[in-house]
């Protein structure tokens, strides 16, 4: 909130914060402002980034990091570093002051190696191959992956509204490419359970 000419006005950070439900809105607002509203990320990089918020659970022995991997690249790695720093900052504040805001501070990197293959898959066989790899490598089944992709789409839709509110047209354009990139094969907006 800001006091402008004796009236209370919601700041840009506040607009972002209230527009985000699928991941931590406080973290999202600071992160988006710090990294210039994802201007350096491609649509594919945004999809990979959003996959970190999908609440996929895998066994500790198959968990994936993100540092220095071919599927991350320097730009995305920088963004994830910044995101992790901001997450840690707010989590530490909650712990220090014994707060329980109910906000989530958990992110994962287990889908990062598979998102590019999914996005670039052109046919049923390539999509099926990605699904088999997810099951074999991570014990992530089709239904879980469908839910994860739908969550990525929802995050994109939330950010579309935020981008419209704060007039970030270039971000809006790239966000609108997400559904076409991820909703294919067994995954559609109508997918509830496979």
Question: Which residues fall in each region the model found?
Answer:
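Short, flexible/disordered secondary-structure transition segments
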Residues: 2-6, 61, 193
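Detector for Asparagine
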Residues: 3-6, 24, 55, 74, ...
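Leucine-rich, amphipathic alpha-helical/linker segments
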Residues: 24-84
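Long amphipathic alpha-helices with heptad-repeat character
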Residues: 76-97, 152
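Long low-complexity, intrinsically disordered regions
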Residues: 97-194
């Amino acid at each position: 909130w800001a006091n402008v000419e004796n009236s209370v006005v919601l700041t840009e950070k506040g607009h972002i914060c209230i527009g985000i439900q699928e991941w931590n809105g406080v973290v999202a607002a600071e992160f988006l402002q710090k990294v210039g509203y994802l201007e350096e990320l491609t649509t594919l990089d945004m999809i990979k980034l959003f996959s970190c918020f999908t609440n996929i659970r895998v066994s500790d022995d198959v968990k994936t990091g993100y540092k220095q991997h071919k599927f991350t690249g320097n730009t995305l790695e920088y963004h994830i570093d910044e995101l992790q720093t901001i997450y840690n900052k707010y989590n530490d504040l909650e712990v220090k002051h014994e707060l329980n805001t109910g906000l989530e501070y958990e992110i994962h990197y287990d889908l990062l190696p598979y998102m590019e293959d999914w996005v670039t898959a052109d046919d049923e066989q390539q999509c099926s191959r990605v699904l088999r790899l997810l099951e074999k490598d991570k014990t992530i089944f089709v239904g879980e992956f469908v839910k994860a992709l739908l969550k990525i789409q929802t995050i994109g839709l939330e950010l579309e509204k935020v981008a419209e509110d704060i007039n970030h047209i270039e971000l809006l354009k790239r966000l609108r490419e997400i559904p076409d990139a991820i909703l294919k094969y067994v995954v559609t907006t109508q997918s509830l359970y496979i």
